[in-house]
């Protein structure tokens, strides 16, 4: 099935939003979890490192989930109707958990019950990725039933699907892996050796487990969504390239780090390699998923908006990007690159 250039641009924009949100959100949610885990180990300052990352980033992360919903609704109204109908309950759960987490993050820096609030924030941040990831297996087919023109999500099939559980495990471990890798880099810049060792160790543990869950996804996908599995096997070179970058990241964590005491590992190099790895893997998955948005009911073309509407929306997105990009760059430079902030220097 051929896909028009306009539809391909639109789906690429949405997939770009999804990828950016997935990476940022996993780091954000994971940082909240690690902040909770190391809360009672004040001598390590691991919680302080996590909070320095969380403080400015969770608000920005929430912006991208709004952008995904708006882009999906505007570019693909046909797909939005089906997804909105079947994901009403899980979507409401996600919004509730995001609201709870955001509220507790706001008050966690001021309230006397700081520990309790951070526990709640950390736990909710641990659950949200597990629910969010279920959108992917739902689009693979087999879980949506149509009765008298009404779409329904068969929850019993989801909770009995090995592929769905593989996705859940992958989401949780990826959250812990990416966040621990980022916080190791933060600790490296902040020159907090105890925190760096803790987060590096966590990355070395959670990384291979997340890869194992990725393998489980492929194995279970072969039985439950063979059309998608076959598509990914046709572009197996992208998966191989993804695995190579994962190995590079692992090697980077064992390279000598002369600029940081006697510690080993180059977390910045590892973080960049893992970012490339997830991009390559997501590209292979997205390419194989075409032309379906929701198999087999909704394709990219059947759910696409009118061409004239797309052109107007696309122009609007370009203008919005031009306006917002300087703000995101300023944010990155102030909080991600400013060593005075990371080290909490006066």
Curated annotation (Swiss-Prot):
Transmembrane segments: 7-27, 63-83, 87-107, 119-139, 164-184, 201-221, 236-256, 269-289, 312-332
GO cellular component terms, semicolon-separated: plasma membrane
Pfam families listed in its UniProt record: Cyt_bd_oxida_II (PF02322)
Main location: membrane
InterPro entries in the record: Cyt-d_oxidase_su2
Example of a GO biological process term: sporulation resulting in formation of a cellular spore
Membrane topology: Multi-pass membrane protein
Subcellular compartments: Cell membrane
Keyword Magnesium: no
Keywords annotated in UniProt: Cell membrane, Membrane, Sporulation, Transmembrane, Transmembrane helix
Known function: May have a role in sporulation. Can compensate for the loss of cytochrome aa3.
Family: Belongs to the cytochrome ubiquinol oxidase subunit 2 family.
Protein name in UniProt: Putative cytochrome bd menaquinol oxidase subunit II
Organism: Bacillus subtilis (strain 168)
Name of the gene: ythB
């Amino acid at each position: 099935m051929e896909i028009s250039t306009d539809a391909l641009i639109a789906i690429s924009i949405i997939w770009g939003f999804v990828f950016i949100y997935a990476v940022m959100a996993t780091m954000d949610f994971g940082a909240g979890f690690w902040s909770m885990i190391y809360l009672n180990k004040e001598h390590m300052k691991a919680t302080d490192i996590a909070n320095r990352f969380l403080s400015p980033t969770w608000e920005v992360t929430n912006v991208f989930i709004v952008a995904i919903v708006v882009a999906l609704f505007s570019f693909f109204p046909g797909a939005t109707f089906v997804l909105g109908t079947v994901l009403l309950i899980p979507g409401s759960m996600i919004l509730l958990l995001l609201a709870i987490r955001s509220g507790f993050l706001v008050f966690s820096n001021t309230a006397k019950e700081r520990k309790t609030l951070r526990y709640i924030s950390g736990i909710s941040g641990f659950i949200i990725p597990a629910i969010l990831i279920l959108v992917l297996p739902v689009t693979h087919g087999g879980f949506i039933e149509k009765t008298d023109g009404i779409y329904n999500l068969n929850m019993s099939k989801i909770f009995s699907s090995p592929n769905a559980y593989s996705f859940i495990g992958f989401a949780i471990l990826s959250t812990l892996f990416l966040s621990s890798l980022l916080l190791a880099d933060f600790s490296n810049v902040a020159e907090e050796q105890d925190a760096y060792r803790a987060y590096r160790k966590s990355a070395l543990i959670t990384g291979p487990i997340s890869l194992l869950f990725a393998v489980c996804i492929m194995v279970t996908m072969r039985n439950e969504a063979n059309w998608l599995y076959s598509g990914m096997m046709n572009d197996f070179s992208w998966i191989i390239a993804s695995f190579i970058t994962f190995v590079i990241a692992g090697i980077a964590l064992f390279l000598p780090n002369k600029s940081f005491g006697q510690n080993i590992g180059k977390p910045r190099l590892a973080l960049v390699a893992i970012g490339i790895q997830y991009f390559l893997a997501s590209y292979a998955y997205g390419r194989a998923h075409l032309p379906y948005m929701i198999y087999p009911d909704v394709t990219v073309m059947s759910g696409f908006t009118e061409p004239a509407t797309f052109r107007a929306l696309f122009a609007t997105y370009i203008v919005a990007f031009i306006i917002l990009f300087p703000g995101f760059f300023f944010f990155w430079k102030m909080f991600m690159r400013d060593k005075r902030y990371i080290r909490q220097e006066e």
